[in-house]
Amino acid sequence: MDSGLGRSSETSLKALPSMASNATRNTDPDQQGVRFSSMDQPPCFARPGQSFPAFPPLFGVQSSSLYLPDDIEAKIGNQFESNPSPNNPTMDWDPQAMLSNLSFLEQKIKQVKDIVQSMSNRESQVAGGSSEAQAKQQLVTADLTCIIIQLISTAGSLLPSMKNPISSNPALRHLSNTLCAPMILGTNCNLRPSANDEATIPDISKTHDYEELMNSLNTTQAESDEMMNCQNPCGGEGSEPIPMEDHDVKESDDGGERENLPPGSYVVLQLEKEEILAPHTHFCLICGKGFKRDANLRMHMRGHGDEYKTAAALAKPSKDSSLESAPVTRYSCPYVGCKRNKEHKKFQPLKTILCVKNHYKRSHCDKSYTCSRCNTKKFSVIADLKTHEKHCGRDKWLCSCGTTFSRKDKLFGHVALFQGHTPALPMDDIKVTGASEQPQGSEAMNTMVGSAGYNFPGSSSDDIPNLDMKMADDPRYFSPLSFDPCFGGLDDFTRPGFDISENPFSFLPSGSCSFGQQNGDS
């Protein structure tokens, strides 16, 4: 079994012309290929009696270098990453940026490993260490979240390269079928050399998983440029970060989706200001009482006689058949200069009367509703006030750059968009209760913060638009990818004794961290 796998691996490696020349220069003349010893055997080949490890469904042959030892990576991985050929059309990503991302992930994993190792060494000291252990657990959770997000972003940069199929090279196809097929398919089956060397790799660019991952990772260029331009250009080392103001506005109520209706296919109606701001739109013809909905008017009419109590009178009026063939009706904002006004060059019509009301109140009316909790934020639509009051007064979610968010999913969206940003921990959670325990707790936290080595370049932000990226609380929510086979599942770590959804991360003080190489002290 071992010799068979060894011969198959030698055959696969010798099939690459560029690898054959390098192997000839770096090995003895009598050696016919690269042999794997029992110590440096790649993880993709199992020893006798040992099951093969499960691989996450990573994309592309380039990802196979993540699972090879250093000596094999120097011979194989650099053929695809470090020396991109201008004649190779499949190399449409930057190898230097990829190496930088992998180095960042390596440092973060080493930091988490050091923290967990320190927790394991001090697990016997139960008395007086509960607050310190809880703070470390929060730090490990935040670091693992950052690692997973950065790993997904790194894998996403490789996805455009999959648009060019690799099946044109028989040797490369055979090597990828032997080493990377389980990683692409996400299976746990044994890796056996295929008898048919002409087997092709499935077109990942057409799969449902590929489309979902691309939709979740890629943000439009306009949104990225707008968010980058919102950074404070004057923010130096001594500048204080400006908290981001969270606007809980639902664009669907405002008719935010832009329609591409051809001209002449719809009729534009423009209501006056008085009609838009009128509290009632339906009135009783007998007593003159007004109502917001026609159903309330029908219920009111029952008090004016038995003829209004019949099923026909209480039923919702049926649509006139003649109106079905009528053109689509859209609405215009009466405010001159607004892009929703029909006189605007880039006119965007509003779909319904409700959209007209919400748009006009939000954009052109005074904000008369004030939050009773913070007494600072004002709204012109009562629904926006109620949405704001749901999270007002709670601890804000903070990023390492100092930007604050009212919701956790928006923080994670911000972290995924800007490289190097991570969720941060509050210093209040690190304080040790008790006067006798405080010196020991402070010293322990200083050691932990120093060993973690966090230091992010300070940056300010002004009204960065919220990236509404809905995420679940489960650590495997990021995409169809599953990281359990690679990381062993986040459940292997000791779960903190708090609810992540109710205890936000805050950030460590500036200047307490650095991504430099550590000395190895845990």
Swiss-Prot record:
Residues 1-43, 234-260 are annotated as: Disordered. One of its GO terms (molecular function) is zinc ion binding. It is found in: Nucleus. Residues 1-12, 19-40 have a biased composition (Polar residues). PROSITE patterns: ZINC_FINGER_C2H2_1, ZINC_FINGER_C2H2_2. Probable transcription factor that may be involved in aluminum tolerance. Keywords: Metal-binding, Nucleus, Repeat, Transcription, Transcription regulation, Zinc, Zinc-finger. A zinc finger (C2H2-type) spans 282-304, 390-421. The keyword Repeat applies. It comes from the Eukaryota. This is Zinc finger protein STOP1 homolog. GO terms for cellular component: nucleus. GO terms for biological process: regulation of DNA-templated transcription; response to acidic pH; response to aluminum ion. Its main location: nucleus. Transmembrane segments: none annotated. Residues 244-260 have a biased composition (Basic and acidic residues). The keyword Ligase does not apply.
